[in-house]
Amino acid sequence: MIQMQTNLDVADNSGARRVQCIKVLGGSKRKYASVGDIIVVSVKEAIPRGRVKKGDVRKAVVVRTAKEVRREDGTAIRFDRNAAVILNNNNEPVGTRIFGPVVRELRAKNFMKIISLAPEVL
């Protein structure tokens, strides 16, 4: 459950280390984002010589949440920390590597590039 002002780790090699959610996309009254939802983020911490800089405003897709994700078969999956992957304007990942596991729900939302780059899909 990601809302405005939520800090997230960045799970790719785009150069950002930590981002803050500044908007949940998908309707003017929408308050929360879950796994697979696109949000607008501000880069709060970045590494030198990365593709994104501190202060950049980018789109990102949520790939891990501390709030559990319930599935059709009754199982639930949750993570220790919230994480996102930075996207470009075509909703493709800026980075070329994904760190850590991602959830299967991204496949239904057509983030195939992230699924293929991820080391583990849960």
From Swiss-Prot:
Give the UniProt entry's GO cellular component terms: cytosolic large ribosomal subunit
List, alphabetically, the Pfam families matched: Ribosomal_L14
* Claim: Flavoprotein is one of the keywords in the record: no
Alphabetically sorted, this entry's keywords are: Ribonucleoprotein, Ribosomal protein, RNA-binding, rRNA-binding
GO BP terms, alphabetized: translation
UniProt family annotation: Belongs to the universal ribosomal protein uL14 family.
Subunit notes for this chain?
Answer: Part of the 50S ribosomal subunit. Forms a cluster with proteins L3 and L19. In the 70S ribosome, L14 and L19 interact and together make contacts with the 16S rRNA in bridges B5 and B8.
Function (record text): Binds to 23S rRNA. Forms part of two intersubunit bridges in the 70S ribosome.
Q: Which NCBIfam families match?
A: rplN_bact
Put simply, this protein is called Large ribosomal subunit protein uL14
To which species is this protein native? Ruegeria sp. (strain TM1040) (Silicibacter sp.)
Q: What is the lineage of its organism?
A: Bacteria, Pseudomonadati, Pseudomonadota, Alphaproteobacteria, Rhodobacterales
